[in-house]
């Protein structure tokens, strides 16, 4: 009896604590799962009971800026209540200063970014209302301390993303910790789930604003924001979406050829649960609105093949892809302008006459493949380029420009097929705009649409075969075709993936030779080499080389592998170089020379790998 009497108080305390926890959870947006049997095992079940309109937003207007054209408000609103604490998001809400309802969209920034007032002002001048959500909580205004506060949950992948991050290390899995919703493995413990909840609440915010036409709402985002776009695209309130450099599915699938580090599967103890509830591949089949993927041909996050694998899951044909070639994570003006056109067409119902995805064919006969493309609206067509590669690593492959033949309205390319190597091919079609368009940071009179990417992938891929292909590229670069094999971020420096071209002799007994004519100027040459995103064992890191050059005639600069500096004391290996970036600075003005134009090629004339 004494033992029973001693037990009763403990039972009472446990009961009181249990009731307290239930009351606490009852106020939460989501009641935590306690048993594995409660955990949803597919995306429909995961979201079926969530109503993004149910809880009041409790909007606060922190500050307003007003001009004759645009009104911008710094606002915060409630995402939800998690672990008994409110999570609130800061954002810029911008709209045209006209008394009418406007088409609108949510913009979700990337993992290294923040919301931008200027972006909202630009799009307001284009006739859109926008909500630019600051989901990472980085500072926005020097005189405003109020910002995003996630309370007791942490939706970030690591402390470097968010100043108020509660975790001290990376987290990508579905396991529970002190800052997740559920105490057991659950898709709601993924950072993406919380970010998608915030995105849906952002749509609710737009719905409730008198300046917004709630029937004309879209969603767009960059990088991590592109993934948020993909997860939010299944919301029936969304009329069109534009994921930038993010949003692809199949991130858990390694590239062919056992390329180490090409997937995120190693992060998951519950890989099947991630596949069925969080990976974008289970969202795209449920998306019914028009989709525009904007990316780069060598994007590390939105990898090239995964874009097309994701779009193949759509149950409608209303999609486009636009990428800039030889670039990573950096769409150019010819891609950015399509955001304006896409939302004009599908949110404002303005007919922009965007061409269909250029029709293409791909046929294999023995050791040869034939690719054809027949772009539509050829009266507006400026250029058609065909690119191919045998390298399964889409992050670092060099896209080779194919020789094409034109017959009437069709371009064709004959490509060799090699045993135990994949082959990838697509066309890039450049179109003229009706008039030049001023973008937020640039302007353009053309835009680009990709064809479908075609490929053959053997069951067994042997990357060693790449090294045995004929070495037909005798000159690294002579600029006879301009910077066709290069890209640029600043319209000054140029970057290429050409060290990954299998038709180039990259033997380590070679030296890098540059022919440069300073034209009487005092110049500083800088070359940056990187191995990032190659298969993990081949990632040597970063290398740099600088040299001063002057004179009035052409001279040859010969650089040995040992001349490049590396923080870890490593030596360059030519086959293990992913990117090569070249910058030349005028030391008198400290301005970079423009290496994208003919004038720059009068100075930087030729690049070779020599004995």
Report residues per predicted region.
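Short beta-strand element of the alpha/beta-hydrolase
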Residues: 90-93, 101-110, 130
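Primarily recognizes the serine-hydrolase "nucleophile elbow" in alpha/beta-hydrolase
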Residues: 200-265
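Short beta-strand/loop motif that positions the catalytic acidic residue
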Residues: 287, 293-295
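Catalytic histidine neighborhood in serine/cysteine hydrolases
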Residues: 314-330
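Extracellular ligand-binding interfaces
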Residues: 475, 486-570, 576, 583-610
């Amino acid at each position: 009896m004494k033992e029973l009497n001693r037990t009763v108080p403990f039972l009472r305390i446990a009961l009181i604590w249990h009731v307290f926890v239930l009351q606490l959870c009852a106020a939460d947006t989501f009641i935590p799962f306690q048993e594995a049997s409660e955990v949803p095992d597919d995306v429909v079940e995961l979201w079926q009971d969530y109503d993004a309109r149910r809880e009041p937003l409790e909007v606060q207007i922190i500050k307003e800026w007003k001009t004759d054209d645009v009104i911008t408000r710094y606002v915060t609103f409630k995402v939800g209540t998690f672990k008994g604490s409110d999570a609130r998001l800061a954002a810029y809400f911008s709209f045209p200063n006209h008394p009418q309802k406007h088409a609108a969209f949510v913009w979700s920034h990337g993992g290294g970014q923040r919301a931008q007032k200027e972006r909202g002002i630009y799009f307001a001048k284009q006739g859109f209302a926008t909500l630019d959500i600051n989901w990472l909580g980085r500072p926005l205004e020097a005189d405003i301390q109020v910002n995003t506060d996630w309370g007791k949950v942490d939706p970030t992948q690591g402390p470097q993303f968010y100043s108020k991050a509660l975790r001290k290390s990376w987290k990508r899995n579905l396991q529970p910790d002190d800052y997740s919703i559920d105490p057991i493995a659950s898709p709601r413990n993924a950072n993406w789930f919380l970010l998608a909840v915030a995105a849906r609440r952002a749509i609710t915010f737009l719905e409730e604003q008198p300046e917004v036409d709630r029937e004309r709402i879209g969603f767009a985002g960059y990088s991590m924001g592109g993934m948020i776009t993909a997860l939010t695209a299944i919301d029936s309130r969304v009329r069109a979406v534009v994921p930038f450099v993010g949003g692809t599915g199949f991130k858990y699938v390694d590239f062919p050829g056992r390329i180490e580090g090409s997937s995120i599967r190693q992060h998951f103890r519950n890989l099947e649960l991630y596949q069925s509830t969080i990976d974008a591949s289970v969202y795209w089949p449920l998306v019914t609105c028009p989709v525009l993927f904007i990316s780069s041909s060598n994007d590390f996050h939105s990898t090239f093949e995964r874009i097309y694998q994701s779009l193949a899951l759509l149950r409608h044909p209303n999609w486009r892809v636009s990428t800039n070639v030889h670039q990573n994570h950096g769409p150019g003006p010819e891609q950015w302008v399509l955001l304006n056109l896409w939302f004009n067409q599908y949110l404002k119902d303005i007919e922009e006459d965007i061409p269909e995805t250029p029709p293409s064919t791909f046929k294999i006969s023995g050791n040869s493949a034939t690719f054809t493309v027949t772009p539509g609206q050829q009266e507006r067509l400026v250029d058609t380029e065909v690119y191919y590669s045998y390298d399964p690593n889409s992050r670092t492959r060099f896209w080779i420009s194919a020789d094409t033949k034109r017959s009437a309205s069709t371009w064709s390319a004959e490509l060799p097929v090699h045993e135990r190597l994949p082959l990838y091919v697509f066309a890039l079609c450049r179109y003229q705009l009706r008039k030049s368009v001023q973008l937020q940071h640039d302007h353009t009179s053309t835009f680009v649409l990709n064809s479908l990417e075609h490929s053959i992938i053997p069951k067994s891929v042997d990357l060693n075969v790449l090294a045995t292909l004929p070495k037909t590229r005798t000159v690294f670069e002579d600029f006879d075709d301009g910077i066709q094999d290069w890209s640029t971020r600043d319209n000054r420096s140029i970057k290429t993936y050409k060290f990954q071209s299998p038709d180039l002799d990259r033997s380590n007994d070679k030296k890098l030779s540059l022919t440069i004519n300073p034209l009487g100027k005092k110049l500083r040459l800088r070359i940056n080499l990187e191995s990032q995103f190659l298969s993990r064992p081949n990632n040597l890191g970063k290398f740099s080389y600088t040299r001063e050059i002057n004179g009035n005639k052409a001279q040859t600069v010969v650089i040995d592998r040992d001349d490049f500096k590396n923080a870890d004391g490593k030596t360059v290996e030519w086959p293990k170089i992913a990117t090569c970036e070249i910058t030349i600075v005028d030391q008198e003005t400290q301005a970079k020379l423009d290496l994208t134009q003919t004038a720059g090629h009068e100075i930087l004339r030729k690049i070779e790998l020599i004995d």
